[in-house]
């Protein structure tokens, strides 16, 4: 039985914070709570940003039935949000050799302490991203999952968690060698890769990583069924830029006549793909992913379904004779997160393309509960301010009457329509 973390604390409560907590199925509430005093094994943090993940929506849908949400969440509600970044506020005596007040941090929520599924953002009463302050659980500290973050660009720190999931997916791909039982991990360098349903926020991150990581394909095909989203992806990650990197990049709307499975295979010269990642839990997409695999092709089912009975057909002849295989990943590890932080802070990747909306802590409940119905990519929350959920695309119009958005519109124009460090600094200084 999974019980809420932090409930055994006996110290007096002394710091008040606003936080969004889950009480049950589709029951999220913005509340003011008190945090326990910082003890010798505690680290208290000030949270600046949190990006809302579809996994939080899934947790809201399932409530206590979710594998990370405690069974007693109705009696001991927990704070949601697990893609967060900020500044260390206070450090307990036993951790002063490792952490310092004023130091930036990012957090790897999946600590897996002693095999536990507990994680900040799901399982703890006093730690989650959709709060102003929080006390980091001892399990996170023991597993080295509170990571130093040496940057003042907080949204990058928030995006290091979703980017680590993408990086972990690439690392989890595997291939075989005739006569050997050892798997060769990672995508095929110089191989043929397809990213299906891949112009949502996670798909955009995958395009960025595929183009700029240390092991790249020679052919990259990105599919979706939405022309507008495909066009946005192509304007950010251009065919010309990919060509400069030695990669042949194609964007394909598979809903259009002639852009079917046969066409996708033709783009490979008929061999099929070495690596395919599926970003939608939709049966036709999953089956297409299997059908375009080549010899020893690896399919990663990245998209997590909420339906526990979700099934799709797979060509088992090809499994036997062509060594096709499937892997599923749902998150990265701490090293993946370190890689994400390093690549972002060094300028190798820019996951700002994932963000299409910004908002304050007051926007979290409605945004999370309606997440599947809100078009666009990542919804980025700044937890220390109040701001309605606002699309970056609406800055220009809002700026006609609001000087804040007029300036943000000017800044985003200079950054190819993307959220940026400059925009973040201006927002936090003026809101």
Positions of predicted regions on the chain:
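Adenosine-nucleotide cofactor-binding segment
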Residues: 190-191, 196, 207, 211-285
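Rossmann-fold NAD(P)-binding glycine/threonine-rich loop
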Residues: 287, 303-323
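C-terminal hydrophobic helical "lid"/dimerization subdomain
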Residues: 177, 257-265, 271, 284-291, ...
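Residues in the short beta-alpha loop(s) of Rossmann-like NAD(P)-binding domains
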Residues: 225-226, 305, 385
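ADP-ribose/adenylate-binding Rossmann-like module
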Residues: 275-280, 291-310
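NAD(P)H dinucleotide-binding glycine-rich loop of Rossmann-like/cofactor-binding domains
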Residues: 71, 109-192
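Glycine-rich beta-strand-centered segment in the early N-terminal region that forms part
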Residues: 36-51, 65-114, 128
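Hydrophobic/small residue at the entry helix of a nucleotide-binding pocket
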Residues: 201-202
């Amino acid at each position: 039985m999974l019980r809420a973390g932090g409930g055994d604390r006996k110290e007096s409560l002394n710091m008040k914070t606003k936080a969004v907590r889950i009480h049950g199925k589709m029951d999220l509430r913005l509340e003011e709570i008190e945090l326990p005093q910082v003890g010798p094994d505690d680290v208290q943090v000030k949270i600046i940003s949190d990006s809302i993940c579809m996994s939080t929506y899934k947790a809201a849908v399932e409530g206590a039935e979710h594998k990370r949400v405690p069974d007693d969440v109705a009696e001991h509600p927990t704070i949601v949000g697990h893609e967060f970044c900020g500044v260390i506020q206070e450090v307990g005596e036993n951790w002063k050799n490792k952490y310092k007040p004023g130091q930036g941090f990012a957090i790897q929520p999946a600590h897996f302490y002693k095999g536990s599924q507990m994680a900040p953002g799901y399982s703890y009463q006093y730690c989650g991203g959709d709060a102003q302050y929080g006390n980091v659980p001892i399990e996170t500290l023991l597993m080295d999952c509170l990571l130093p973050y040496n940057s003042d660009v907080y949204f990058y720190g928030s995006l290091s968690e979703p980017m680590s999931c993408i990086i972990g997916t690439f690392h989890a791909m595997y291939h075989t060698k005739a006569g050997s039982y050892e798997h060769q991990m990672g995508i095929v360098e110089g191989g043929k890769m397809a990213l299906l349903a891949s112009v949502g926020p996670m798909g955009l991150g995958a395009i960025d990583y595929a183009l700029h990581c240390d092991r790249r394909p020679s052919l990259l095909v990105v599919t979706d069924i939405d022309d507008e989203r495909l066009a946005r992806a192509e304007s950010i990650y251009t065919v010309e830029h990919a060509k400069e990197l030695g990669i042949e990049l194609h964007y394909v709307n598979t809903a259009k006549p002639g852009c079917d499975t046969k066409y996708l295979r033709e783009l490979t010269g008929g061999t099929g793909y070495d690596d395919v990642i599926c970003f939608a839990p939709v049966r036709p997409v999953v089956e297409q992913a299997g059908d375009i695999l080549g010899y020893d092709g690896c399919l990663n089912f990245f998209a997590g379904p909420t339906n526990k009975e979700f099934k799709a057909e797979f060509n088992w002849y090809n499994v036997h004779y062509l060594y096709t295989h499937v892997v599923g990943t749902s998150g990265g590890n701490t090293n993946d997160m370190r890689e994400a932080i390093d690549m972002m802070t060094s300028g190798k990747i820019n996951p700002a393309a994932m963000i299409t909306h910004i908002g304050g802590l007051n926007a979290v409940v409605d945004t999370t509960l309606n997440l599947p119905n809100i078009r666009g990519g990542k919804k980025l929350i700044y937890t220390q301010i109040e701001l309605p959920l606002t699309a970056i695309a609406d800055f220009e119009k809002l700026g006609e009457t609001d000087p804040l958005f007029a300036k943000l519109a000017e800044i985003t124009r200079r950054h190819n329509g993307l959220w940026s460090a400059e925009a973040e600094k201006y927002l936090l200084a003026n809101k």
